[in-house]
Amino acid sequence: MSTICAGGQTLESKYGGRAPPQIQLPDRQWPSKKLTESPIWLSTDLRDGNQALPNPMTTSQKWQMFRLLVDIGFKQIEVSFPCASDTEYTFTRALVETPGAVPDDVSLEVMTPCRKETLVRAVESLKGAKKAILFTYLATSDNYRETILQRSEAETLEHVRDCIEYARAITKEDPEARQTEWSLGFGMEDFANARPDAALRLAEVIQAAWQPSRENPVILGLASSVEAATVNIFADQVEYFSRHLSSRETVCISIHTHNDRGGAAAAAELACLAGGDRVEGCLFGNGERAGNLDLVTAAMNCFTQGMETGLDFSNLPEIRRVYESITQLPVHPRTPYSGDYYFRAFSGAHQDAIRKGLQKRAANSSKSPWKVPYLPLDPADLGVSFDNVIGVNSQSGKGGVAWLIQNGLALSIPTQLAASFSHVVKEQSVAQERGLAAEEICALFADRYDLRDSPSGRVVREHGYIAAFQHPGCALELEDVTEQAARAAGILTRGLDFLLRCTRAASHPLGGPDDSNLTVAFVQCAVTEKAEEAWGIGIGFSQDSAIDRALLSVMNRHYQPTPIRAPLATNDSVIPRPEPIRGG
């Protein structure tokens, strides 16, 4: 049974004929190639990006965006559509005329329709610039040409020849304009749906009219204006075009992809394998409809393959903050590289794998290739804190909890303690009906194990015995005690409703700059009379004092005031000492 679409058409009759013209390329080369260097990057945030905003940028916001793009490292920036409004034209002139605004190695690009009167306006906006790209465009596919231009192919070719010759005359052949280094770009609108032979004929006309050179090639923009096919088809189209151009060495092929099917980044990458030299896009994928190519994604894909990109995203959170402030568009939390959740693992298995991977890397002095499971790159390379790597919810496990405690409190807790505390975290997450932030988990840990203040007790050790225990409402302090006095303190256990037996202990020095003389101890105790296990944590100036405080931490949580009736038992010790430290 055929699906019936809106308007009563069948699925096949409505969408079945949209496939681009078939290209016969049995010897295609791009599938066996590998990217080894980054393409030229063109930012069109101030043009394509700006026109797609519900509220286009003000002049001050344009200046802010331009400075951001320069700081990132873009060398080609499309800044305006001068014939659209006086605001666009004036902004371009301000860039040219403001001393020091445009670095000498940055080319200003403006876009304009392929008409003589608009070409003049665009050239006037750029006069005096050190490096300028005059970029014009025209529909290339039969559908766009017939629907929008209502011209034959022959009429279109003649129109383009006339306009490009005119552009050459008013730029690089004009004595007054020669102080600017002019380049020409021509965008083939809807190239992805154009007949290959028609696109090549247009390219030959443009080359003949502009007369490019190896040193100053003409830029031919191949646009997937509305993504309508799989990315391999676009790659075939680009390779066919590249291989059949005459004077290929005088042409820079520029790739302009859109994200209508979600394939902008993949289409651009495969197009570069197929012959693309430059890619066009916007920060975070801004642009009409589903957006243009996300330049952050494209650049970081190269970066994570070991390629120099020339772009600096080492403080990506700040770049994103400025971008969101200017555009009022939020970056989706799942956006590659830049989203809040890009690095974040909620799965317990993933968290444990990340923790182990980072420990292995640290053990290798952090000089080995990056191979941490589930982390595509080091968050620090984007200026992202490791606090953002682990997200804890009711699905998380002990590995993530241990990682957050280590990062937030500098405590390397034993695996068994992490497992025990993870149940507490899960209960809290379920109760709150949300995930818990790292700060909340650290606070919960500190509260549960008496880490906010010293344990509510005082310990004086003599010959390995705990000699005092204190709790609100029940206190005993013995100072300068002898071994006999310490044994006499056995009355405490007779006054409690439980007895502790230490079953596991571990410790490590604290690693902070102010903690060089401190040790933290983790003690697991069997709580008799209650048939349960409990953990205590203590910090002291020695391993013994840290263990004492850890034991007090356990006693404080389990103490229930009861009348003390037992007689003094001089041969009893309060708490059996733990086994030797065995680690976590």
Curated annotation (Swiss-Prot):
EC number: 2.3.3.13
One annotated GO molecular function: 2-isopropylmalate synthase activity
GO CC term, one of those recorded: mitochondrion
Pfam family, one: IPMS_D2
Keyword Zinc-finger listed: no
Family according to the record: Belongs to the alpha-IPM synthase/homocitrate synthase family. LeuA type 2 subfamily.
Name of the protein this chain belongs to: Isopropyl malate synthase htyA
Organism per entry: Aspergillus rugulosus (Emericella rugulosa)
